[in-house]
UniProtKB/Swiss-Prot annotation:
<dbReference type="InterPro" id="IPR038009">
    <property type="entry name" value="GlmU_C_LbH"/>
</dbReference>
<feature type="binding site">
    <location>
        <position position="226"/>
    </location>
    <ligand>
        <name>Mg(2+)</name>
    </ligand>
</feature>
<feature type="binding site">
    <location>
        <position position="75"/>
    </location>
    <ligand>
        <name>UDP-N-acetyl-alpha-D-glucosamine</name>
    </ligand>
</feature>
<dbReference type="InterPro" id="IPR001451">
    <property type="entry name" value="Hexapep"/>
</dbReference>
<keyword id="KW-0548">Nucleotidyltransferase</keyword>
<keyword id="KW-0573">Peptidoglycan synthesis</keyword>
<dbReference type="GO" id="GO:0019134">
    <property type="term" value="F:glucosamine-1-phosphate N-acetyltransferase activity"/>
</dbReference>
<dbReference type="Pfam" id="PF00132">
    <property type="entry name" value="Hexapep"/>
</dbReference>
<dbReference type="GO" id="GO:0000902">
    <property type="term" value="P:cell morphogenesis"/>
</dbReference>
<feature type="binding site">
    <location>
        <position position="226"/>
    </location>
    <ligand>
        <name>UDP-N-acetyl-alpha-D-glucosamine</name>
    </ligand>
</feature>
<comment type="function">
    <text>Catalyzes the last two sequential reactions in the de novo biosynthetic pathway for UDP-N-acetylglucosamine (UDP-GlcNAc). The C-terminal domain catalyzes the transfer of acetyl group from acetyl coenzyme A to glucosamine-1-phosphate (GlcN-1-P) to produce N-acetylglucosamine-1-phosphate (GlcNAc-1-P), which is converted into UDP-GlcNAc by the transfer of uridine 5-monophosphate (from uridine 5-triphosphate), a reaction catalyzed by the N-terminal domain.</text>
</comment>
<dbReference type="GO" id="GO:0003977">
    <property type="term" value="F:UDP-N-acetylglucosamine diphosphorylase activity"/>
</dbReference>
<dbReference type="GO" id="GO:0009245">
    <property type="term" value="P:lipid A biosynthetic process"/>
</dbReference>
<dbReference type="InterPro" id="IPR011004">
    <property type="entry name" value="Trimer_LpxA-like_sf"/>
</dbReference>
<keyword id="KW-0012">Acyltransferase</keyword>
<feature type="binding site">
    <location>
        <position position="168"/>
    </location>
    <ligand>
        <name>UDP-N-acetyl-alpha-D-glucosamine</name>
    </ligand>
</feature>
<dbReference type="InterPro" id="IPR050065">
    <property type="entry name" value="GlmU-like"/>
</dbReference>
Length: 455
């Protein structure tokens, strides 16, 4: 038996109701294109081949998906879902099974697709759902024994059929041999004059194939996106699910409705997240982490007992246990904070390591620097790392004291336990235990008369 699994993803729609120059499948949900959600799910279930059927904006779609290994097939005319799958037949293996998915139905889960595949015993399985309001959706017809006999589209349904509440999601797992057999025989003899993929169900029933049906765990798994309102609604449903998952793991949210998770977040115990916090990319939070209001954390690792005060931005940062950051701190890529460091108001760190117990508390920029343990940066102290062409490194030894409003002009090294006087511009290396002052002498003119304004 051939157990290979192919996915056919229909992604040719223009998405006119989006009022966008971008193809619909490139619209963003949780910081990721709709189509990318589907592709990531396919990767997680070890698909052997993925075929994407594209149409409007095909160049844009292909350029946006270069990180994936895909087979692209163009649908030049949009003549229905059956036609869309039919154009992929030349790329479809003759054996194995195929999942038929949609680029604008982004949230079907890997677990649901795995169950759908397992349910395909006789050649075809499908994802259905019983809903309160089935208007506009294809209805599932069953016989007295509960066997599926047909799918009837809304515009072709009788009054009795329109009363059926079990609907077709359009997501199937079908033996490739059946797709090769049935798709060439589809007809467009219907109200829409389109080639319905649903007609393969009728063909399978006529051949005596028992069609299996399963339901997803969540209704949003089969919800499609056609306009901005639906996109926003689906975003909120997805966010609620992600927040719920973290709550189960012990995270306390000040308001579960005012947080956005746009990636993967792993957590320890007793994490607290205040309002309007955004997580992007891969984020890990240790035990007893507190994140106050308005922070954005992207691709960062946060250790135990870290306190992040309001309105901080982290991007590719590693923060060790016991650190306190903010408010209004900006940690840029390749920032490493060691244990018990403290960053305060309006501090920016870029491509630098701040040693254990060091403090950069006020109005500072530290870039391309290696800062030792126990160092104190006074208010307004900065590293001058860029000469207009190249970046240069600043090294500060353990227990150094950098006075207020100091400029360290890289490349420069400050020795251990060195002291830099306030207001200095340091352009040369400073030895261990030395005091360096690089500023003009104070001049005082007694009885100074200010200039008077000319009349």
């Amino acid at each position: 038996m051939n157990n290979t699994l192919t996915t056919i993803i229909l992604a040719a729609g223009k998405g006119t109701r989006m009022q966008s120059a971008k193809p619909k499948v490139l619209q963003i949900l949780a910081d990721k294109p709709l189509l990318a959600h589907v592709l990531d799910t396919c990767q997680s279930i070890s698909v052997d081949k993925t075929i994407v059927v594209y149409g409007f904006g095909g160049d844009q779609v292909q350029q946006a998906m270069t990180d994936y290994s895909l087979t692209w097939v163009e649908q030049t005319e949009q003549l229905g879902t059956g036609h869309a799958v039919k154009v992929a037949l030349d790329e479809l293996p003759s054996t194995g099974k195929s999942l038929i998915l949609y680029g604008d139905v982004p949230l079907v889960s890997a677990e649901t697709l795995s169950r759908l595949k397992q349910a395909n015993v006789q050649g075809m399985s499908m994802l259905t759902l019983t809903v309160d309001n089935p208007f506009g959706l294809g209805r599932i017809k069953r016989d007295e024994q509960g066997n599926i006999t047909a799918i009837v589209e809304q515009k072709d349904a009788s009054e009795q059929e329109q009363a059926i509440r079990e609907i077709n999601s359009g997501i199937y797992c079908v033996d490739n041999a059946l797709l090769h057999q049935y798709l060439p025989n589809l007809s467009n003899d219907n109200a829409q004059q389109e080639y319905y993929l649903t007609d393969i169900v009728k063909m399978a029933v006529a051949d005596g194939i028992a069609i299996a049906a399963i339901e997803p765990d969540y209704e949003f798994e089969i919800e499609g996106v056609n306009n901005r309102q639906q996109l926003a609604q689906l975003e909120r449903k997805w966010q609620a699910k992600l927040v719920e998952d973290l709550q189960v793991q012990g995270v306390q949210f000040a308001d579960p409705n005012r947080v956005d998770i746009r990636g993967e977040v792993s957590v320890g115990q007793d994490v607290f997240v205040d309002i309007n916090v955004v997580f992007k990319g891969k984020v890990s939070l240790g035990n007893n982490v507190t994140i106050e209001a308005g922070c954005m954390i992207k691709d960062s690792q946060i250790g135990d007992n870290v306190h992040i005060k309001p309105y901080c931005v982290f991007d590719d940062a590693q923060v060790a246990q016991g650190a306190t950051i903010g408010p209004f701190a900006h940690l840029r890529p390749q920032t490493v904070l060691e244990k018990n460091t403290r960053l305060g108001n309006f501090v920016e760190i870029k491509k630098s390591r701040i040693g254990e117990g060091s403090k950069v508390n006020h109005l500072s920029y530290v870039g391309d620097a290696q800062i030792g343990a126990g160092v104190n940066f006074g208010a307004g102290a900065i590293t001058c790392n860029y000469d207009g062409v190249n970046k240069h490194q600043t090294i500060v030894g353990d227990n150094a004291f950098i006075g207020t409003n100091t400029s360290l002009v890289a490349p420069v090294t400050i020795g251990q336990t060195a002291t830099i006087g306030a207001g200095s511009v340091i352009t040369k290396n400073v030895e261990d235990n030395a005091l360096a002052i690089g500023r003009g002498r104070q001049v005082q003119k007694d009885n100074y008369q200010r200039p008077e304004k000319k009349k």
